[in-house]
Amino acid sequence: MIEPDILRKAQLIMLDMLIEFDAICKKHQLRYWLDSGTLLGAVRHAGFIPWDDDIDLSMPVEDYNIFMEIAASELSSDIFFQTSKTDKAFKFDYIKLRSNKSSIVEFHEKDRQINYHQGVFVDIFPMLTIENTEANKNMYDSTLEKIRRASSVSLHTPDGKDDPETRKALAESLQQHHQGWDDGSRKIIYGGQMPDVAAWFDLAEVLPLKDIEFEKHFFPAPNNPDHYLKAIYQFDYKQMPPEDKRVTHADSISFT
């Protein structure tokens, strides 16, 4: 169990990374929003879920690709921009901002030889849009299931199959359905880099974005957070879970 003061110190480092990322996005007019547990924390706690040990963000794929190009030149020396290209041992398909002032060992990494950068982190995922049809919903669900079967590393099942080339091809097949952001009747979907979440969202309930309070700062969020969170979570997210479910991903956190 991570001691509360250690976890809080890690959360404040992540908050600093989010503030820096937000400033870069404002400078370059890039869109992003709080996602998953970070959005839930903003709605329910006006900050981190008390036991959360990461930050989740999403970006329209066009903005995500621009950020990929400028990140190395824009980020401060406190942050490592982690991709499978900047860190050859990193086998995940999305990007992370990693703190150079800390280290986190997640439970799935415990007792394994890890060679990639392990600073506390911010996850960033690319988002797409598709036409709102039953055929597209079936295609999306089927594609994510195929990606899951090729994602033992990213889904923390080391005895399973890991096939980066298959994942890449499947994610690219999703991008071929991308329709842009100008029609509120479309659905927003994850780009396949987070295949354990198969939610899709009404574009009109996400854009335009609105600011939401998080740790006494304000950051972009879907304009209807309730719609977004209900699409992700199959439980009443407004209620605190039982104490035995209030667990971190981390086995240990340390600082340099």
Report each predicted region and the residues it spans.
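Conserved catalytic core of two-metal-ion nucleotidyltransferases
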Residues: I2-K26, A71-N132, S151-I232, K238-T256
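Short aromatic-enriched loop/helix-cap "lid" or pocket-rim segments at secondary-structure transitions
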Residues: H45-A46, A135-N138
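Active-site nucleotide-donor binding segment shared across nucleotidyl transfer reactions
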Residues: D22-I55, M59, Y64, I232
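Short amphipathic alpha-helical patches
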Residues: F48-I49, D63, R148, S252-T256
